[in-house]
């Protein structure tokens, strides 16, 4: 179980803004209320709508996100809207009960080399599924 916390992202050597979406996933499963204050960037909470699909309870007001811990996340289709949000969706999907499908994985693949192989090597049940539409699009490009 994760312990609730309050975090404020800051420039180095403070808590890194690039880790904010991933830590938010952990705090979604913490007991109680946690608060994240984004002290570096505007619009860093774009992932929140996606993680809501998994059952997370996050309310955003400006640069502050209030997270109410839930007992479990439940698998659902989600999208990676950027690199860090994509990593957060993968983490949330691995923690969720049931299947989570992450779309727009090009963001994740751009920033995390061999992430599927590495996570599988750690025991994660994760794989890339290419849809017929994606296969057709790839064939027409190459």
What kind of feature is each model-predicted range?
Residues 4-142:
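Short, structured segments at the rim of ligand-binding sites
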């Amino acid at each position: 179980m994760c312990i609730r916390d309050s975090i404020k992202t800051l420039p180095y050597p403070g808590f890194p803004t690039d880790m904010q979406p991933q830590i938010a996933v952990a705090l979604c499963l913490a007991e109680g209320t946690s608060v994240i204050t984004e002290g570096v960037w505007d619009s860093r909470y774009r992932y929140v709508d996606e993680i809501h699909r998994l059952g997370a309870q996050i309310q955003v007001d400006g640069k502050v996100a209030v997270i109410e811990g839930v007992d479990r996340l439940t698998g659902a289709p989600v999208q990676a809207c950027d690199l860090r949000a994509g990593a957060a969706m993968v983490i949330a999907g691995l923690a969720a009960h049931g299947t989570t499908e992450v779309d727009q994985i090009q963001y994740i693949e751009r920033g995390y080399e061999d992430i599927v192989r590495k996570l599988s090597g750690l025991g994660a049940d994760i794989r890339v599924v290419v849809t017929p539409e994606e296969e057709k699009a790839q064939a027409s490009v190459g």
